[in-house]
Amino acid sequence: EISRSDWSSDVCSSDLTKLLDIKDPNIQFIDIINRDTHKEIIAKLDYNAPSCPECGSQMKKYDFQKPSKIPYLETTGMPTRILLKKRRFKCYHCSKMMVAETSIVKKNHQIPRIINQKIAQKLIEKTSMTDIAHQLAISTSTVIRKLNDFRFKPDFSYLPEIMSWDEYAFTKGKMSFIAQNFDNLNIITVLEGRTQAIIRNHFLRYDRAVRCQVKIITMDMFSPYYDLAKQLFPNAKIVLDRFHIVQHMSRAMSRMRVQIMNQFHRKSHEYKATKRYWKLIQQDSRKLSDKRFYRPTFRMHLTNKEILDKLLSYSEDLKHHYNVYQLLLFHFQNKEADKFFGLIEDNIKLVHPLFQTIFKTFLKDKEKIVNALQLPYSNAKLEATNNLIKLIKRNAFGFRNFENFKKRIFIALNIKKERTNFVLSRS
């Protein structure tokens, strides 16, 4: 079904020009057609014949080209396209033909500049390329071509004094490496793999003098990074992420609780209570609520502290490991490195092998953990960046091409902060 608008060309042509933000005075609007799925704006491009670019003679108006179908931004919530008839000119001296040109679209192009600008704007957001194409009524290939217009030029003459290292999943079973400037959150590099060879080859492209400027590197408890970081950045201190240190202790406590819980009969009260209230054992004891509620498992009103006392009364082993765990948390959160490691050394032979494993790891990485307690740096900012990367990946239902994925990361995370690092191709 097609409906045509009744309008005065003198008034509406001017209004439509303002509405569409078209500044070319040589475009004249003729009609608007409202179709079921979109709007079509009929227009023509015409102006006085120019001189011939070949011989310099005066050209003459010849005819109009077949209408170009130019996609445009939505109007009144409907996809819109302009059917633009362009004047052709002919030189009767050398037979040169030329088509009229307009500022709204490049020569020999069909996608207008305003749509290209909108694509670039949406690429900065976390929208998938398929959704961008659907929203702007263009092909996905057009969006990918615009993505490829962005060029990231790594600056091998500079590295920040403080940077963060981490990894993220690019495809199933394959981890990639990412490094970020701790202060301004700009991405330094994204590498397809996280092997020592890949990371070493990348950072060796920086001069040693540049690498010696790095003072701090924050990272997870991933041992292959330790020696590599010291080789590449001889002046850098390694700071382990505090969250992952606490996570190691928490997991050891959780596994210990499960082992003790499984010693009880599955239908016993002890088993059910230990399983149901597992969070109270994991929680920092200083944050336990003192509000009293009716607890169906115990058939009485109890506070969280009273429930915890009952759980710990079921097993001396559980009580001992819980007390060690809580003391470790206390010293760690108060940044008391000497007391933290003193407690580990005093108890390493008295605890379950589950705790012994993490205690040995902590003692081996003592210097890096002390740095984490003494210095105000962590991997929290990079973990937040990784969440944004996961969002980009999830919205796109995954990426097959690593370079496209890498560009989306740089565009989304760097371009708002430092546009000088990007060159938008004008070709």
What are these regions (language model features)?
Residues 27-40, 66-80:
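Short Cys/His-rich Zn2+-coordinating modules
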Residues 49, 54, 60, 147, ...:
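Acidic/histidine-rich catalytic cores and adjacent linkers
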Residues 245-266:
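Short alpha-helix plus adjacent loop in nuclease-associated cores
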Residues 45-49, 84-87:
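Short metal-coordination and nucleic-acid-contact micro-motifs, chiefly zinc-binding Cys/His arrays
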Residues 14, 19-47:
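Short helix-coil boundary/hinge micro-motifs
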Residues 103-110, 181-195:
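Glycine-rich phosphate-binding "P-loop"
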Residues 1-12:
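Single conserved hydrophobic/aromatic residue that forms the stacking wall/gate
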Residues 56, 69-163, 167-174, 211-214, ...:
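Short, positively charged, Gly/Tyr-enriched micro-motifs
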